[in-house]
């Protein structure tokens, strides 16, 4: 989702996540109904199996990097061995295994976003929702993280809904772009077609 600040990107993402109510219509992922105003149906966020990464570095400073990533798994009915496996795998895939015992406060901004990404990855999501996750990083780190996000998506095959106001970020990361302005969808197309039109 691409558009200027205040155009409704984050609100739309929050509706997809289940954090906001719909005014009308419905939300589906594939054939799975998530929300429907007409049918008065609402699937709670914890049952949607979505990984979420916010713009702010959403990490718990009183927990280690490992515990930050393992935390959502501990809320599910998952064995200790499975929690350890998934957490270790997520840390490995985000290049955080060597800092697993450190505090997130010991990491750079990019490191903190990797922790949030690893936490979202550990739940084996059907869809990843990313709300301007790179906007507070310096340009060099932002570009590096773009490649990492794209590589993770290709490796695991989950869909990503990515919110940004940065056109180059949208062009580099997307298979399809939805352009928004003043709360309305202006265009949905491939990056190339949007660039050419």
What are these regions (language model features)?
Residues 2-4:
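The feature captures the beta-strand-to-loop junction immediately N-terminal to the Walker
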Residues 7:
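ATP-binding Walker
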Residues 17:
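Helix-to-loop junction immediately C-terminal to a conserved catalytic motif
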Residues 23-26, 182:
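Conserved coupling/switch loops of ABC nucleotide-binding domains, chiefly the family-specific signature
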């Amino acid at each position: 989702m691409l558009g200027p600040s205040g155009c409704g990107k984050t609100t739309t993402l929050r509706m997809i996540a289940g954090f906001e109510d719909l005014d009308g219509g419905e939300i589906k992922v594939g054939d799975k109904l998530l929300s429907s105003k007409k049918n008065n149906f609402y699937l709670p966020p914890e049952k949607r199996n979505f990984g979420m990464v916010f713009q702010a570095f959403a990490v718990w400073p009183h927990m280690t990097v490992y515990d930050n990533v393992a935390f959502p798994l501990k809320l599910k009915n998952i064995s200790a061995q499975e929690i350890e496996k998934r957490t270790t795998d997520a840390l490995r895939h985000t290049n955080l295994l060597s800092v697993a015992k450190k505090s997130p406060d010991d990491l750079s901004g990019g490191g903190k976003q990797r922790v949030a990404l690893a936490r979202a990855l550990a739940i084996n999501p059907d869809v990843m929702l990313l709300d301007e996750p790179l906007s507070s990083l310096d340009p060099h780190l932002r570009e590096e993280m773009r490649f990492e996000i794209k590589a993770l998506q290709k490796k695991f095959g989950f869909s990503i809904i990515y919110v940004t106001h940065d056109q180059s970020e949208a062009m580099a990361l997307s298979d399809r772009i939805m352009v928004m302005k003043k709360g309305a969808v202006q265009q949905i197309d491939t990056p190339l077609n949007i660039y050419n039109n």
